[in-house]
From Swiss-Prot:
Region described as Disordered: spans on this chain: 120-146, 402-421
Function: May be involved in transcriptional regulation.
GO BP annotation list: regulation of transcription by RNA polymerase II
Regions annotated as coiled coil: none
Source superkingdom: Eukaryota
Encoding gene, per UniProt annotation: ZNF584
Record-stated family: Belongs to the krueppel C2H2-type zinc-finger protein family.
Primary subcellular site in the record, as a coarse category: nucleus
Name of the protein in question: Zinc finger protein 584
Domain KRAB per the UniProt entry, residue ranges: 17-88
CDD domains linked: KRAB_A-box (cd07765)
Bias (Basic and acidic residues): 120-129, 404-415
Keywords for the protein's UniProt record, in alphabetical order: DNA-binding, Metal-binding, Nucleus, Repeat, Transcription, Transcription regulation, Zinc, Zinc-finger
Length: 421
């Protein structure tokens, strides 16, 4: 007893978490139920945590799990997995379970004796509500024999934390839970349920009202869903495992890579049902639809002009302020927008990626190429409503319209010019 007490007080023995303590295991059957995205997420989480624990000097030089993870093509399950299950009945009794968990129903199939360590707790056990049999689709009242049959099916999917006895249902959040046992967290939330490393992380108004329930332990940012929190936490690791095969740019999330690759492929899967315009990102389509409903909520206080989008409003204000925040490091020229600087940079690099399919001439931008191609088709789609004259480019039409303004006519008369359309 004295030895145990001494070990508990020894600071060198407290707060350590080994890689194997935060490793999630799957049986072959469970692994087979995961789709490609879920398997990729599992792989990312394991590799990131191996890197994190390694940086603390707490991981083995070569973990069996890490070796298995490097093989992307093989669906695997570690042969040395030895884990114990928790039945739903044990989970309902609360979090104060002692010792190892065991299957309560003796009729459980031997395959159900495999379970997995846990990550994320979900309160899904509501008293008095009927439980639905996930395999047969039947609903059972609490305590019925059919409900006991359901316990057999889910026995292998309920897990228990070996440190505090909490029971969980899912296998993708144990890292979040176990870290609470391994880090010093002196600042406790006023509700008494959570602790943080920094006092600035505590924001009980948002967390306990349900507005945001999942908080990042590094920066205190809160999220409504654990999946969004996991995506955010990759920012702090600095790991960017997803690399673009075309330009070499790396990303910390696979979905970010997919969006980026649409730049190279030209894929624009989101189409506006009103005008047929397509977009590569769904959020851009949502913003675009405001054009059709006539929403213009942003007003410039300098000139009274209205804008549909906040970013367009900000760019417009630079006309009044003269701000040109994007400067070319090569020649010092400044630009209002980042895209303007990017187009200018091609002057220095000589890059002309847009080629005319009719004559082979190349251009720095897609719009320049499209404008050039109109010369081949002799398309004149911009017509003056005053005189009916047609032009190939909208900019030429705008320049022409000045001829019809009273100021321009007065000026031409003063110089003895004859205005003709």
């Amino acid at each position: 007893m004295a030895g145990e007490a001494e070990a508990q007080l020894d600071p060198s023995l407290q707060g350590l978490v080994m890689f194997e303590d935060v490793t999630v295991y799957f049986s072959r059957e469970e692994w087979g139920l995961l789709n490609v995205t879920q398997k990729g997420l599992y792989r990312d989480v394991m590799l990131e945590n191996f890197a994190l624990v390694s940086s603390l000097g707490l991981a083995p030089s070569r973990s069996p799990v890490f070796t298995q993870l490097e093989d992307d093509e093989q669906s695997w399950v570690p042969s040395w997995v030895d884990v114990t299950p928790v039945s739903r009945a044990e989970a309902r009794r609360g979090f104060g379970l002692d010792g190892l968990c065991r299957v309560e129903d003796e009729r459980a199939h031997p395959e159900h004796l495999k379970s997995y360590r846990v990550i994320q707790h979900q309160d899904t056990h509501s008293e008095g509500k009927p439980r639905r049999h996930t395999e047969h689709g039947a609903a059972f009242p609490p305590g019925s024999s059919c409900g006991q049959q359901q316990e057999v099916h889910v026995a292998e999917k309920l897990f228990k934390c070996s440190d505090c006895g909490k029971v969980f249902l899912k296998a993708f959040a144990l890292l979040d839970h176990l870290i609470t046992h391994s880090e010093e967290r002196p600042f406790r939330c006023p509700t008494g349920r959570s602790a943080f490393k920094k006092s600035a992380h505590i924001n009980p108004r948002k967390i306990h009202t349900g507005e945001t329930a999942h908080v990042c332990n590094e920066c205190g940012k809160a999220f409504s869903y654990p999946s969004k929190l996991r995506k955010h936490q990759k920012v702090h690791t600095g790991i960017k495992p997803f690399k673009c095969s075309d330009c070499g740019k790396t990303f910390n999330r696979k979905d970010a890579l997919v969006l980026h690759q649409r730049i190279h492929t030209g894929e624009r899967p989101y189409e506006c049902s009103k005008c047929g315009k397509t977009f590569s990102v769904l959020s851009t389509l949502i913003r675009h639809r405001k054009v059709h409903i006539g929403e213009r909520p942003y007003e410039c206080t300098e000139c009274g002009k209205f804008f549909k989008y906040n970013n367009s409003f900000i760019l417009h204000q630079r006309v009044h302020t003269g701000e040109r925040p994007f400067e070319c490091k090569q020649c010092g020229k400044g630009y209002v927008t980042r895209s303007g600087l990017y187009q200018h940079w091609k002057v220095h690099t000589g890059e002309r990626p847009y080629e005319c399919s009719l004559c082979g001439k190349t251009f720095t931008t897609r719009s320049y190429r499209n404008r050039h191609q109109q010369f081949h088709t002799e398309e004149r789609s911009y017509e003056c409503t005053e005189c009916g004259k047609a032009f190939k480019h909208s900019s030429t039409l705008l320049q022409h319209k000045k001829v019809h303004t009273p100021e321009r006519r007065q000026e031409d008369r003063a110089h003895g010019k004859v205005v003709s359309c």
